[in-house]
Structure formats: C-alpha cells, structure tokens
Swiss-Prot record:
Belongs to the DnaT family. GO terms for cellular component: primosome complex. It comes from Escherichia coli O6:H1 (strain CFT073 / ATCC 700928 / UPEC). Homooligomerizes. Interacts with PriB. Component of the replication restart primosome. Primosome assembly occurs via a 'hand-off' mechanism. PriA binds to replication forks, subsequently PriB then DnaT bind; DnaT then displaces ssDNA to generate the helicase loading substrate. Keywords: DNA replication, DNA-binding, Primosome. This is Replication restart protein DnaT.
C-alpha cells in the first residue's frame, strides 16, 4: 500500500511515546508523521501549529467577499406545464417558447440579454408557418434562439432604424476642419 507523508519529519511510535516533547520540539513546522510497523499511523501536531491550522480553516470557511450570487441561478424554475404537442409538429399561431427559454438558450450557446419580444416571435412564427416544416418543440426553441441571435447581431445589437425617419445633418465642425 502506498501512502504520502505530508511532512519531512518522521518518527516511530515508540520514540514518540518515550519522549513526545523533545520529538515535537525538534519537528520542522510543528508536525511529525508517526509510523508504526513501517506504515504511517498518524500525525503529531504541536499546540501552536494546531492553532495556526484551525485559524486557517476558519478563514477559508468564511466567504472571500460580500458578493452573493442570486439563488435563482442555482434553482430550477418550477413552471406549470404547458400543453406542448408531442413529437414533431408544424408551427402554429399560438406557439410559445418555454418560460425558461433564456436559460435554455444559454445552455445551447446563445446568450440572450432580453426575452423574446412579441414582434420577434410573430415574425418567427409567420416565417415557419409558411415553410410548413415539422420539428420537435425543443428544436423550434433552438431555431428561435439562433434566429434571435442572428437578427439581433445584424445591426450590432441596436434596434433597426425607421426608414421613414428624415435624418438631420450635424451642424458641428469636427476639430481640424475649417468652417
């Protein structure tokens, strides 16, 4: 049986029993590995070293900062089950993604900052209704997540500009240009 000794100081159990104070006083770091029949039996620790170890353990048990994570990150949301068609189905007008859609999208590698807007969902449903393809509910959600990712990134995350808005020229002259 192999074992790892965590201190360079090793002593037999008989030597420790005979004169424990001298053995511990000579110990480097206040710890001695005690062997019995050429096998490690236990560690002998000085009171000062034990106090250091207990203080270190107490320090490590306390949180390193006062920042606490939201419990919501650790708990699965308990939502009422929604009647989702079993198996594959074609897109229908009242289809909705799950309540925890943003969390699921993150699991699929799509980071969404805000939930699906009614306009985005309506556009997605209208497109896929016309296509007439059939997928499982989870696949529809994955398609919606990818669609949102691509749609929102196409304009650098900014909302689409209204094409009917008349632009107004800037009247300021940049530094370095003559006016």
């Amino acid at each position: 049986m192999s074992s790892r000794v965590l201190t360079p100081d090793v002593v037999g159990i008989d030597a420790l029993v005979h004169d424990h104070q001298t053995v511990l006083a000579k110990a480097e770091g206040g710890v001695v590995a005690v062997f019995d029949n050429n096998a490690p039996a236990f560690y002998a620790v000085t009171p000062a070293r034990l106090a250091e170890l207990l203080a270190l353990e107490e320090k490590l048990a306390r949180p390193g900062s006062d920042v606490a994570l939201d419990d919501q990150l650790y708990q699965e949301p308990q939502t009422a089950p929604v009647a989702v068609p079993m198996g594959k189905f074609a897109m229908y007008p009242d289809w909705q993604p799950d309540a925890d859609f943003i969390r699921l999208a993150a699991l699929w590698g799509v980071a969404l900052r805000e939930p699906v807007t009614a306009e985005e969902l309506a556009s997605f449903i209208a497109y896929w209704q016309a296509e007439g393809k059939v997928f499982h509910h989870v696949q529809w959600q994955q398609k919606l997540a990818r669609s949102l990712q691509i749609g929102r990134a196409s304009n650098g995350g900014l909302p689409k500009r209204d094409v009917n808005t008349v632009s107004e020229p800037d009247s300021q002259i940049p530094p370095g240009f003559r006016g």
